[in-house]
């Protein structure tokens, strides 16, 4: 990376504190997983809200910090990570007897867990290799300014992605429970339903941002690096596609047979890296990196479908019919009116609100009438009516 010599000390502090934060987050995984496995989503939500509020507080503290803001920022993030770990650990220690540390030696269990963790580590390394490799390639061929543009796009992606991640987290225990009970029909239903619902919600959030990216970035940052708008749009497309991957990833974890999954997906990530290098070297266009990532994710989705068919017997044609067909209908029908408004109106605040309102109305209606089957619409209607009576008819 290109780091100014006078900022090398701060960069080293940031690097060390980032490693320490990563270690704390890894140690906290068994406790947060226990909370999710017991479906204590209220506690999970409280901890998440605390985490978000504290990170927001950091932003205000940075404005008045009398010392190096980068080191101060990294230090506070590390402190928040410690608090998150303590909250998870203390709650699990009080509520769940199995979270207590006891001396046990089960060779078969250790072998199984070791294999699971090792192959998961391979998959995670391949993802880090590709994602960080993109940063290095952008830095090498396009410079730090273009890398900053990617950083902005990733910030927006993380903010939007957190919403559907929480929804998927709430569904994951049921997918795993269905597999453990050998109830494959219910498992397929949950995979299909969560894929569609998370996709529709993500589409509802991302379409206005993709259309009005220039306006939003102008209000948020004023001046921003070149390529930021294109990076943001392509990154959000990848984010939408990830909603189709997450349920299948959870289903794979439920089987415990992660070797084939991580080997194939990891190989795809690694193979794409030299291809990306050749393309950026020949074209010099940074957008091609993100376009290749979109293509890779599409290939990865269908690769995962073949893995699901082999591992849990999920028919690919059923996924195409019950998920992909509905999604395609929602994508095109939900975007027509917002896109027309975007093209016909001037770039003003009025257009921004008009496009946002049109996206909410059109995508909601398209998702309800075209994106759900009859049973899902009935369940959704009953749920909305139930919430209405609880909130407004007390």
List each model region and its residues.
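Interfacial/gating helices of multi-pass transporter permease domains
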Residues: 70-75, 108-117, 136-158, 185-190, ...
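Membrane-interface helix-loop junctions in multi-pass transport and translocation proteins
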Residues: 38-42, 53-86, 90, 94, ...
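Alpha-helical transmembrane segments of polytopic membrane transporters and translocases
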Residues: 20, 76, 82, 118-119, ...
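Alpha-helical transmembrane segments of multi-pass membrane transport and lipid-handling proteins
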Residues: 1-2, 61, 164, 188-243, ...
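Membrane-interface junctions at transmembrane-helix termini in multi-pass inner-membrane proteins
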Residues: 22-50, 71, 92, 236-268, ...
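Interhelical loop/hinge segments that connect adjacent transmembrane helices in multipass membrane
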Residues: 70-76, 86-132, 174, 181-189, ...
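Helix-loop junctions and terminal segments of transmembrane helices
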Residues: 37, 96-97, 153, 157-195, ...
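Membrane-proximal transmembrane or re-entrant/amphipathic helices at the cytosolic face
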Residues: 309-317, 338-394
């Amino acid at each position: 990376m290109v780091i100014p010599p006078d900022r090398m000390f701060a960069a080293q502090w940031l690097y060390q504190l980032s490693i320490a934060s990563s270690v704390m987050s890894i140690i906290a995984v068994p406790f947060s997983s226990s909370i999710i496995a017991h479906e204590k989503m209220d506690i999970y939500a409280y901890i998440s809200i605390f985490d978000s509020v504290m990170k927001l507080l950091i932003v205000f503290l940075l404005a008045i910090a009398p010392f190096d803001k980068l080191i101060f920022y990294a230090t506070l993030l590390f402190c928040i990570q410690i608090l998150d770990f303590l909250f998870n650990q203390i709650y699990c220690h009080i509520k769940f007897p199995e979270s207590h540390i006891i001396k046990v030696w089960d060779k078969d269990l250790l072998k199984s867990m070791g294999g699971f963790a090792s192959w998961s580590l391979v998959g995670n390394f391949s993802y880090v290799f590709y994602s960080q490799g993109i940063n290095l390639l952008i830095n090498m061929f396009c410079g730090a300014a273009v890398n900053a543009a990617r950083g902005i796009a990733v910030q927006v992606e993380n903010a939007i992605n957190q919403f559907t991640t929480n929804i998927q987290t709430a569904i994951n225990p049921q997918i795993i429970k269905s597999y453990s009970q050998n109830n494959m029909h219910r498992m397929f239903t949950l995979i299909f339903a969560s894929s569609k619902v998370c996709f529709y919600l993500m589409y509802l959030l991302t379409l206005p941002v993709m259309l009005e990216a220039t306006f939003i970035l102008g209000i948020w940052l004023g001046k921003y690096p070149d390529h930021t708008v294109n990076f943001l749009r392509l990154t959000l497309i990848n984010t939408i596609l990830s909603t189709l991957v997450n349920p299948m990833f959870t289903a794979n974890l439920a089987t415990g047979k992660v070797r084939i999954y991580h080997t194939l997906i990891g190989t795809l990530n690694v193979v794409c890296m030299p291809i990306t290098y050749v393309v950026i070297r020949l074209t010099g266009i940074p957008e091609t990196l993100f376009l290749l990532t979109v293509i890779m994710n599409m290939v990865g989705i269908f690769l995962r479908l073949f893995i699901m068919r082999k591992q849990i017997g999920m028919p690919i044609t059923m996924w195409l019919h019950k998920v992909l067909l509905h999604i395609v209908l929602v994508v095109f029908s939900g975007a027509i009116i917002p896109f027309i408004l975007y093209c016909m109106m001037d770039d003003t605040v009025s257009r921004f609100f008009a496009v946002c309102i049109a996206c909410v109305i059109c995508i909601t209606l398209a998702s309800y009438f075209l994106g759900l089957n009859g049973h899902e619409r009935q369940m959704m209607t009953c749920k909305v009516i139930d919430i209405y009576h609880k909130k407004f008819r007390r």
